[in-house]
Structures are given as C-alpha cells and as structure tokens.
C-alpha cells in the first residue's frame, strides 16, 4: 500500500510539471508570433521587462568585469558599465532584437511556428515554478519563462549575448 501511495504521489508531481509546461506553451507561442511579426504590444504582454532587463544588465556587467586588470579602458568601462547596461537593457528588450534568438531555434520569418502542443513538449521545468526552452532536449536553458498575473512571461535569457543585436 505504501509503495502504491508513493507511486501515485510521484505521478501526480510529474503531472504538475507537465501541466505547467503545456500551460506556458500558449504564451510562448504568442511570444514567438510577436517576435516574428515585430508586434510590440503582444511582445510586451509576454515579457517581464524588469526581470529580463535586470538579468541582461547583470550579465553585461559581469562580462565587463572580466576585462584585464590595469587596463585604463577596462577601468573606464567598469565605471560606465552600469549606465551602459541600463541603456542596453532598454534597447535590447524588443521583438526585433529577439528575432536572432528565434532564428537560432529555427523559427525564421518564413518558418511556420509550431502549435502549443509541440512547444509544450519542448519546454522543461526550471524550478521555482518556471519553465525554460532549450535548443535540444538535454541542452541548457536558453529562455526562461515565469508565470505572472496569469500570463507566462519571458523572464530570463541565458544565451550568448552576441545574439541580441539591434541591427540586422
């Protein structure tokens, strides 16, 4: 009896993760369409701008601090980096910038975006009620989504920062 109860509990918990992934899939689909169509209104509804901006700024600052010590230009960069990172966070969080990320996933301008069932199967639980998108099933998270006020929003970007370009 105890083993059966543990098995049911394990299935229930794994089911929650599955439901979470498929719940997020509709919003991830809407985000992908907004990126493809450069639809700022829908993009903004599916992006946690403050969280994403903070995360991008943090990564930019970390990259700046990796500069060679004793380098005068590096010291100036470190001094100015919070201001530059703040501006970059504003400039980089927009649909046309994330088009390179969509291209990386194989969603070019002429590629049909898969339905929510396909997207849900590609998402994986990321802990703390978040889900993430990976390039391969066993690969690292590239995009992280968090549910806020009933909508799953892009809240983290773990990809190569060079993918976020303002000019094409």
Specify the residue positions occupied by each region the protein language model found.
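C-terminal motif of bacterial Sec signal peptides marking the signal peptidase cleavage site
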Residues: 12-15
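Bacterial signal peptide processing site
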Residues: 17-20
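Early exported N-terminus immediately downstream of N-terminal targeting peptides
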Residues: 40-93, 97-98
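Exposed beta-sheet edge and beta->alpha loop/turn motif
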Residues: 85-168
């Amino acid at each position: 009896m105890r083993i059966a109860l543990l098995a049911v509990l394990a299935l229930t918990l794994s089911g929650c993760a599955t439901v979470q992934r498929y719940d997020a899939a509709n919003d991830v689909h809407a985000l992908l369409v907004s990126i493809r169509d450069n639809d700022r209104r829908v993009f903004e509804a599916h992006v946690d701008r403050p969280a994403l901006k903070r995360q991008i700024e943090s990564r930019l600052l970390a990259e700046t601090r990796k500069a060679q010590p004793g380098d005068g230009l590096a010291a100036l960069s470190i001094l100015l980096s919070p201001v530059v990172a703040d501006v970059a966070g504003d400039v980089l969080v927009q649909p046309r910038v994330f088009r390179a990320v969509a291209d990386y996933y194989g969603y070019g301008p002429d590629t049909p975006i898969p339905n929510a069932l396909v997207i849900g199967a590609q998402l994986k639980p990321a802990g703390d009620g978040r889900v993430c998108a990976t390039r391969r099933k066993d690969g690292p998270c590239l995009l992280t989504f968090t549910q806020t006020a009933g909508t799953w929003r892009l809240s983290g970007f773990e990809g190569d920062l060079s993918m976020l370009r303002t000019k094409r």
